[in-house]
Amino acid sequence: MSSACRSLMVVGTSSHVGKTLLVAALCRLLKKAGKKVAPFKAQNMSLNAYVTPEGHEIAYAQALQAWAAGIPPAVEMNPILLKPQGNLTSQVVLNGVAVDTCRAGEYYERWFAPAWEAVKTALARLQQQYEWIICEGAGSPAEVNLKHRDLANTRVALHLGSPTWLVADIDRGGALAHVVGTLQLLEPAERALIRGIVINKFRGARELLQPGLDWLENYTGIPVVGVLPWLDWVLPQEDSMGLEAGPQLWENRRERAGRGSCLEIAVIRLPQVANFSDFDPLLAEPSVHLRWVHPGQSLGSPDVVILPGSKTTLKDLLALQKTGLADQLRLYSGHIVGICGGLQMLGQTIADPAGLEGVAGTYPGLGFLPLTTVLQPTKVTQQVQTQSRWPAPAPVQGYEIHQGSTQADPAGCLPIFEQEGLGWRDPTGRVWGSYLHGLFDNHRWRRHWLNELRRQKGWDPLPELEGHYAQQREELLDCLAEAWRPHLEWQQLLE
């Protein structure tokens, strides 16, 4: 190990306490302090994925943290990605490549040893390149029934000898008890690494909390290094569990934007929804109101319905059919969009000859576009740069993550991009779909599409935008770091 590289581990009392954003904020603060810093998460379970420039698949959360650090995302930052497929099975992505689909017990039998070797190799490579590694744990480090096969928490901290911060979510209630209970369940060597406690999502006056903090420090002997305020704005969620607050947050955006000339876009909340980060740029548009529609709910009368990506296209398509949402879509007269798995659903048929998603066979799609898809074992993971043909010529960049090849009938649909196989539309433009994740990140293309919708409603166009959502994301990451800077004793890391 390189003695020049320092590290900090961030673990939590449970999932969704704010570890991901704290790591992102620390990466940005250290970057601003002139340090070469990289994020790391040994194992992530998420359907929100990103493709690195080399074509490796990692969790989107680690890509976000890499951008916060001012560096390109790399596979070493997330060597193991587990993508749930339902029925207690997950696709195993090791070193950026899908290698297996198995149940939890099978995963630990087949992949625990090679996964730990991949973790150590990834850390060694990062240590050779960076001055700092900010490591994120997963869930809680104190799950005693899982400790012997936990790759992501104190095993990493012990391997690095890394000082560790423990994060608790006070908004849920019981934060002090969560901290004390977590510490009591750790082994002595693990507890000795805990050098700081962070209380996250705090609302109210610090002085009202201070007696509890004093007690906590006295009882545990560990300093409270941060009391982070609740942030009333949206950054990307790590996984679909974080979307449960989504409808409320999206409705709040609507209240702030007002009901003026505001396009309403409904996104179908598929059971295995994937890459919902695709919609962050639309969420940032003040003239757009997004809302989730769960299978079984009424579609309403939105201007646009989007079928997002799915880890299990056939299962999610069946959910639409069983709950009546497919019938609602057939009666719907507005615009329909499909992204990745959603694109596949818009076609005539989806064939699964190898039974990748269950029983082998050919299944009917929704029938909105003359497309036929064949699911294939080989996964496509690559970044893309191309030019759009519709709704106007514009440079476009994004990335593909899919298992399947789609063929289009040129008599019934038109290509959207210069590069073949990325997306198609019907002759009217009312229905379209694309394999391209990150499509809405392209400012110019997104505004062309939104303005076409506005034109059809007789509304004035929005100003054209050049550039990419990455610029707004940079501003959000700066805001995150500056919002937490005065509430976090991060400068002790530099001592």
Swiss-Prot record:
Gene3D superfamilies: 3.40.50.880, P-loop containing nucleotide triphosphate hydrolases. Pathway: Cofactor biosynthesis; adenosylcobalamin biosynthesis. It comes from the Bacteria. GO terms for biological process: cobalamin biosynthetic process. InterPro entries: Class_I_gatase-like, CobQ/CobB/MinD/ParA_Nub-bd_dom, CobQ_GATase1, CobQ_N, CobQ_synth, GATase_3, P-loop_NTPase. Keywords: Cobalamin biosynthesis, Glutamine amidotransferase. One of its GO terms (molecular function) is catalytic activity. HAMAP family: CobQ. Belongs to the CobB/CobQ family. CobQ subfamily. Catalyzes amidations at positions B, D, E, and G on adenosylcobyrinic A,C-diamide. NH(2) groups are provided by glutamine, and one molecule of ATP is hydrogenolyzed for each amidation. This is Cobyric acid synthase.
